[in-house]
Amino acid sequence: MKYRRGKKTNHKVFGEAMAILAGDGLQALAYEVMLSCIAKSDNMGYEILKKIKAANEIVMAAGTEAMVSGQVMDINSCSDKDSLTMLEKMHRMKTGALITAAVVAGATLAGADERQVVAFRKYGENIGLVFQMVDDKLDVSGDSRTLGKDIHADERNEKTTYTALLSPEELDDLIRKHTQDAKEAIEGVCVCPQGLMKLADDLMLRCG
């Protein structure tokens, strides 16, 4: 990948070693921000427990049981014709885990109860899959100037994608299904669902 958001990627500008260090530094900074917030809390009761749970959600998503394992699967999928089940598992652990962590952490800090957290988790998992499906679709049908990144990169790298395993019609149906599942998950449990509903719709409509 040479471009992201219309600019050259970190490793193309500064080299792979500096890019890896930048990633390590940013991840450590995220932990620093979260733990500093916890350490400065005067209230050692419910409020600090919410912060710990939110931080744990993010750390777990970035760790060996989620993003790291998903990335290993992605690397090993090169030149393989993986099943749709394996592809979905990989993206649940990568993109899906990070998006879900952001949603659940936010809900936890806002005081969501257990039932609401389950609903937000389901929303995040489905949105994560939709995000990747749309991304795969745009990689073969989008414009690099509009997207701000290289296209056909997955094909060149012989990666297994949703577009490689499904017809355009099947992929569109799956995008609609997971979008609807995400929206239904938070119906009746989210006080102000409009923003999250719009996010789901906008993501689906992004691919036309």
Over which residues does each language-model region extend?
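Mg2+-dependent prenyl diphosphate-binding active-site environment of isoprenoid biosynthetic enzymes
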Residues: 1-204
